[in-house]
């Protein structure tokens, strides 16, 4: 499954894995998964977290290692982002629910994920997605960026 991923995708997923793997031991625990999900405004129960881990925990050790994570991501990509998942993701970023993601909102979410970005990096991310040049990202622009990944 993971062998169908490009090198770019693999390195992108490695970066995402590192965001989850807070202590850097090469495994994602339910605690680490919960921390990241809560920072994104989700509120999973312990049982839900355990289910998510069990779903991809091939060796049954109760954690997700990088190869297991890659398989999960490859599976998720095959399901391709449903409209509902994209709307949900957009809502996570659009803190004030005004239909736009501002630089401040983007910075806030990225900081919660443990990504320390400079103002330049945040502005660059906005510029890349901001088709109509209004300095923020609307839903259509967000979908374009997410589908291009």
Swiss-Prot record:
Predominant location category: membrane
Binding site for Ca(2+) 3: 94, 96, 98, 105
Disruption-associated phenotype: Compromised nonhost resistance (NHR) to the nonadapted fungal pathogens Phakopsora pachyrhizi and Blumeria graminis f.sp. hordei.
Disulfide bond positions: none
Membrane topology per record: Peripheral membrane protein
Limits of the EF-hand domain: 8-43, 44-79, 81-116, 117-149
GO terms for biological process, alphabetical: defense response to fungus; detection of calcium ion; regulation of photomorphogenesis
Residues annotated to bind Ca(2+) 1: 21, 23, 25, 27, 32
Binding site for Ca(2+) 2: 57, 59, 61, 63, 68
Compartments it resides in: Cell membrane; Nucleus
Sites where the protein binds Ca(2+) 4: 130, 132, 134, 136, 141
GO molecular function, a single term: calcium ion binding
Assigned GO CC terms: cytosol; nucleus; plasma membrane
Family matches, as PROSITE patterns: EF_HAND_1, EF_HAND_2
Superkingdom: Eukaryota
Pfam families linked: EF-hand_7
Quaternary structure annotation from Swiss-Prot or TrEMBL: Interacts with MPK8. Binds to ABCG36 in a Ca(2+)-dependent manner.
Entries under PANTHER family matching the protein: CALMODULIN (PTHR23048:SF53), MYOSIN LIGHT CHAIN 1, 3 (PTHR23048)
Other remarks in the entry: This protein has four functional calcium-binding sites.
Family: Belongs to the calmodulin family.
Protein's name in the database: Calmodulin-7
Source species: Arabidopsis thaliana (Mouse-ear cress)
């Amino acid at each position: 499954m993971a062998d169908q991923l490009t090198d770019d995708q693999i390195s992108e997923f490695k970066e995402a894995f590192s965001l989850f793997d807070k202590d850097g031991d090469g495994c994602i625990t339910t605690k680490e998964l919960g921390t990241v999900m809560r920072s994104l405004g989700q509120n999973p129960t312990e049982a839900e977290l355990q289910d998510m881990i069990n779903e991809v925990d091939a060796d049954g050790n109760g954690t997700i290692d990088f190869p297991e994570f890659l398989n999960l991501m490859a599976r998720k990509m095959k399901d391709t982002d449903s409209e509902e998942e994209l709307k949900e993701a957009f809502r996570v970023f659009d803190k004030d629910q005004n239909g736009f993601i501002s630089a401040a909102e983007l910075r806030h979410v990225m900081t919660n994920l443990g990504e320390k970005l400079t103002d330049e990096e945040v502005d660059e991310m906005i510029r890349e997605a901001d088709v109509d040049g209004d300095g923020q990202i609307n839903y259509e622009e967000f979908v374009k960026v997410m589908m291009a990944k």
